[in-house]
Amino acid sequence: MAPNPLRAVLKTFLALLLTVCTALVVVSAGTPAQAAGSKYPTLGIPPAGANDWACETTRRRPHPAVIVHGTFGDQKSLLDPLSLSLKRDGFCVFSLDYGNRATGPIQDSARELKRFVNRVLGATDAGKVQIVGHSQGGMMPRYYIKNLGGAGKVEDLVGLAPSNHGTESTGSFSTKSFCPACAQQAAGSDFLTALNNPDETPGTVDYTQVVTKYDEVVTPYTSGFLTPGPRSTNITLQDYCPVNLAEHVTIPMDRLAIAWTLNAFRRHGPANADAPLGCI
């Protein structure tokens, strides 16, 4: 019997929801010190097609692809379709778990990303990587690019519903004790103010931001945009497919979002906003 994609999506969503709920229970049941010391386990399983450390790049696909998960996520959840699509297109694909399910300080997570990118480059003998990240995973690499030497090691950064300017949906509870990264992703936070000034798109990296009007986590959804220009393109899925129903959780599995990722990775420069991509 063929697998039911809707069932798979719901199963993954419920798993993530359980993770978030568990974190909230920790906050409500424990002291701030206890919450701050909590560890959120992962299985350490990469998405399908990823982390083949013997993979060799090609002239057609010279840059390894690195997938970066979002807050409360892990390298496996939600990311199989994206990883498989990149692998089938000829990329060497890699992914990592980081930051205690991406709840720790974003600066520390960026340092983990730096070490991982260096490992990927060493294993593949490539000069640069191409990064695609979901939610915080689309924003956090910008800290690596701006402050940790990543500008010379990243060819492309594609953000899928990235939290580039934070979110107004931070909730009424305090998140600093159990999720410093959540507090840092609040709209107007000191972290984001420093990250976005004076230049949102530093270096020679090509930036592509793919967002959905139905994002219920990064709000407003336009918070994911960066300043447009020759090296920066903003894509709203519903502008190309009005009936596209992707939202924050499902966007990394969405076929149109994946198509835009491939569009960006296959060409020099960011994604081509005039590409004839529509409902898939």
Model-derived segments and their meaning:
Residues 84, 88, 146-147, 263:
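Short, well-ordered alpha-helices that flank and scaffold nucleotide-derived cofactor binding pockets
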Residues 68-69, 93-96, 107-201:
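Serine-dependent carboxylesterase/thioesterase catalytic core
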Residues 36-128:
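Active-site catalytic motif of lipid deacylating hydrolases and related acyltransferases
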Residues 65, 93-95, 157, 207-209, ...:
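Conserved beta-strand scaffold positions in the cores of enzyme catalytic domains, especially
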Residues 1-35:
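Secretory targeting and sorting signals
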Residues 53, 177-180, 239, 277:
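Extracellular secreted precursors and ectodomains with disulfide-bonded cysteine-rich loops/domains
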Residues 203-280:
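C-terminal catalytic-base region of ester-bond hydrolases, centering on the histidine
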Residues 70-73, 98-104, 178-182, 245-251:
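Second-shell loop/turn segments in exported
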